[in-house]
């Protein structure tokens, strides 16, 4: 039951209090009234956090205690827009991987092999985000490595063992947990062989890294220095078995679509052949026809591709998909900026045509969803600079003219509801 102050002061006579935390209506931003109780915005937020955590742990699981593919894809849909085929491939691969681990202890005459995953798609289409979301769903340690920083052992740069060290750190040095984790190696297209022919000189950051990754991806006992690097020769090494670590590799593979198209042209020669200009097809559409031989042609060695049996290609994002990414996911960019403005007690509103204009600009930049934040920052920079010192603003409205740079955002004031500020840029 909410409390009412018994003070004789006129202002505090009918002060309402939150029934849960006891704070008064003056100490919180909002106080929501029920038939006999009151709850403040802070308690509502706390309740939502508790429910979110419980939902995460009470995920529907198969008999093996592993989330089902349908459950995995359902959660992925909440965070990642589009890419249905890639999400389906990933959810099945991850489900099978952890089901394999659940059965590993049981004696069986059939040994289940590990299926690492290769994600191929244009920049900004959600490869990294998919891998991060998967690790959150399964609740296992996750680490991300940049393939461009890796070199062969003995050369200046990061050893491949450093990847396992990062995973160990993500697992708080719990070796058992780390051995069930997920490793995402980004930019694998940058470690492609520099030439189609084997060279007499060593390619320490290209083919050399691919060779170094082979063993840890397939399964080996890696000796990991807890303090990293070679600067502490006296330290004791931790032994980490990589057999059950799921490796997901991703890359944009710029130019791979041309290799696929060239292979297709060879098989469609003659009077009855359908000839389509490469410009007529989107990159994602061409990538659907990807075969392992195309990756070999690109510069990955056959042994490396052999360790990545699951191939998932991602579509390049069109205008409608980018608009959805801006507004629909749980942590959509628009929702993030609206939350920032709420902290100033200001409502942030975007017109539909403004979202479309932002999406168009991201497509022109060719950076996919990654470019959306920088466009948003540019649009809202002046507003975020001015807002903390402005009095009485209750709403900021963004139109397509604001995105184009021909007008300033519309400020709506609470004390003078008719007064609006919209000065041409």
Curated annotation (Swiss-Prot):
Pfam families: AAA_2 (PF07724), ClpB_D2-small (PF10431), zf-C4_ClpX (PF06689)
GO biological process: cell division; proteolysis involved in protein catabolic process
MF terms (GO), sorted A to Z: ATP binding; ATP hydrolysis activity; ATP-dependent protein folding chaperone; protein dimerization activity; unfolded protein binding; zinc ion binding
Keywords tagged on the record: ATP-binding, Chaperone, Metal-binding, Nucleotide-binding, Zinc
Domain (ClpX-type ZB): residue spans on this chain: 6-59
InterPro entries: AAA+_ATPase, ATP-dep_Clp_protease_ClpX, ATPase_AAA_core, Clp_ATPase_C, Clp_protease_ATP-bd_su_ClpX, ClpX_bact, P-loop_NTPase, Znf_CppX_C4
Domain of life from the UniProt record: Bacteria
Binding annotation for Zn(2+): 18, 21, 40, 43
Residues at which ATP binds: 122-129
Gene Ontology CC annotations of this record: HslUV protease complex
HAMAP family found in the cross-reference section: ClpX
Functional description taken from the UniProt entry: ATP-dependent specificity component of the Clp protease. It directs the protease to specific substrates. Can perform chaperone functions in the absence of ClpP.
Description of how the protein assembles with itself and partners: Component of the ClpX-ClpP complex. Forms a hexameric ring that, in the presence of ATP, binds to fourteen ClpP subunits assembled into a disk-like structure with a central cavity, resembling the structure of eukaryotic proteasomes.
Family the UniProt entry places it in: Belongs to the ClpX chaperone family.
PANTHER family cross-referenced by the UniProt entry: ATP-DEPENDENT CLP PROTEASE ATP-BINDING SUBUNIT CLPX-LIKE, MITOCHONDRIAL, ATP-DEPENDENT CLP PROTEASE ATP-BINDING SUBUNIT CLPX-LIKE, MITOCHONDRIAL-RELATED
Protein name: ATP-dependent Clp protease ATP-binding subunit ClpX
Organism field: Sinorhizobium fredii (strain NBRC 101917 / NGR234)
Name of the encoding gene: clpX
